[in-house]
Amino acid sequence: MAINREILAKSDIKVEVELKRSLIGKLDSKVKTLKALGLKRIGDRKIHVLNKSLQGMLNSVISMVLLSEVKNG
């Protein structure tokens, strides 16, 4: 998950967030954070613009998601 941390260090870029772990048995706060990001099932992907509020949300669920930078092309 070191790659996730490198991407989080950047700002104002587009990132794709993919849910990699199940929500079963997780804390309610983490489940609500993931649902606010638009992730409900394993494999769900959403594209977001990385800003300070999104960085805070992703920091709390970093072990459950995979981040990748979206290249404009």
UniProtKB/Swiss-Prot annotation:
Listed GO CC annotations: large ribosomal subunit
Keyword entries, A-Z: Ribonucleoprotein, Ribosomal protein
The keyword Hydrolase is annotated on this UniProt entry: no
Pfam family, one: Ribosomal_L30
SUPFAM superfamilies for the chain: Ribosomal protein L30p/L7e
Domain of life: Bacteria
InterPro entries recorded: Ribo_uL30_ferredoxin-like_sf (IPR036919), Ribosomal_uL30_bac-type (IPR005996), Ribosomal_uL30_ferredoxin-like (IPR016082)
Keyword Thylakoid belongs to the record: no
Protein family: Belongs to the universal ribosomal protein uL30 family.
Subunit structure: Part of the 50S ribosomal subunit.
Listed name of the protein: Large ribosomal subunit protein uL30
Organismal lineage: Bacteria, Pseudomonadati, Spirochaetota, Spirochaetia, Spirochaetales
Gene: rpmD
